[in-house]
Amino acid sequence: EGGSNVLQRMWIVDFAKGLPRLAEPLFRQHFGESCCHEYFTRCGEIGFQANVRHEGRVEGYNCFVRTDGTWLRQFLLPGARPGHIQSNSDNTLIIGDSGCLAPDDSEGRAFMSLIRHENGRGIVTRLCRHDTSWKTQVSHPHPIFSPDDRWALYASDAGGACNVYMADVTSI
C-alpha cells in the first residue's frame, strides 16, 4: 500500500525458491505508468488499476496478472478510472466506485458502476449513486460483490455518517 506514483509498486515473494526475503517485481512498471488498488480475485489472479501517460493525456486501465507476473489482459476505460474496484466470482464483471463514461465526465465520481470487459475496452454502466464526500478513507465506497454476486456492497457518508449500502446488481 502506498502512493501510486512510484517506480515499482507491486512486488511478490516466491517462497518456493527458498529465498523468503527476496522480493521481485510482480509487474514491471515503465516510465509514465502507475498502478494502484491491487487485489486478489476469487480465481487467484491479481487485479489492479493502471494509469498510462499517452500523447499528453492519462489513460486508465483495469489489468490482470497471474501470481508469477504473467500478463493476462488489460482493458482501457472510457473515462477516469474508479478509485477502487473488485471482481465478481468469475472475473466477468467489476464493481467500481465511480462511473465516468467519457474523459470529461465530471459527474461520474458520484456513481457506483459495473464494468464489463469487451475487446480490450471497459464498458461502464452506472448502477446507482453513492454521493459520498470522499473526505476520509472510511467514506471511500470500497465496493465488493456479495458471495453470490447478486449485490454490490459499498460505504457512503451521503446521509451524514458512514453507512454500508447494498445495490442489486441484477437490476440492470
Identify the meaning behind each predicted range.
Residues 3-12, 56-64, 103-113, 160-168:
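Structural motif
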Residues 6, 34-36, 58, 81-83, ...:
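Beta-rich catalytic cores
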